[in-house]
Swiss-Prot record:
Subunit structure as annotated in this protein's UniProt entry: Interacts with cwf13/snw1.
GO biological process, one term: mRNA splicing, via spliceosome
Descriptive protein name: Peptidyl-prolyl cis-trans isomerase ppi1
MF annotations from Gene Ontology: peptidyl-prolyl cis-trans isomerase activity
EC number(s) per entry: 5.2.1.8
Species for this entry: Schizosaccharomyces pombe (strain 972 / ATCC 24843) (Fission yeast)
Gene that specifies this protein: ppi1
Length: 155
């Protein structure tokens, strides 16, 4: 377990997982990808110069489960920071509420440090992420045209 490739409607994004820093989170993401959980799932939230967020099979931003059941605990480390574009973190609704939703940063987002588990980074396909960040959205930051994960491949 080391990488996951997201084959999206705009191109491929290769993600390196930080298995030493966030083993439980990485196992969750990797297993969900391997089992096809993310296949066909949309990026339901896109905010330019901030994040692209996906991983909710309901497409609402309120759904998703983990391989551990409903939610699982954060794995936050003081040596990992949201320093720039391409950081992979868990989306959550507060402390220890991780499930299947994740986001990829499009810029430095230091105010997220200590609040979201960082568990990987984009090693190829950052231009795809940046293009996603330019997609037209509605007033709820939802893309007008769906951005899909066609297939998530555990490598």
């Amino acid at each position: 377990m080391a990488n996951v490739e997201l084959q999206t409607s705009l191109g491929k994004i290769l993600i390196e997982l930080y298995t030493e820093h966030a083993p439980k989170t990485c196992q969750n993401f990797y297993t969900l990808a391997k089992e096809g959980y993310y296949d066909g799932v949309i990026f339901h939230r896109v905010i330019p110069d901030f994040v692209i967020q996906g991983g909710d099979p309901t497409g609402t931003g309120r759904g998703g489960t983990s391989i551990y059941g409903d939610k699982f605990d954060d794995e936050i480390h003081s040596d990992l920071h949201h320093t720039g574009a391409g950081i992979l973190s868990m989306a959550n609704a507060g402390p220890n509420t991780n499930s299947s939703q994740f986001f990829i940063t499009l810029a430095p987002t230091p105010w997220l440090d200590g609040k979201h588990t960082i568990f990987g980074r984009v090693v190829s396909g950052l231009s795809v992420c940046k293009r996603m960040g330019l997609i037209r959205t509605d007033s709820s930051d939802r893309p007008i045209e769906p951005l899909k994960i066609i297939k998530a491949v555990a490598l």
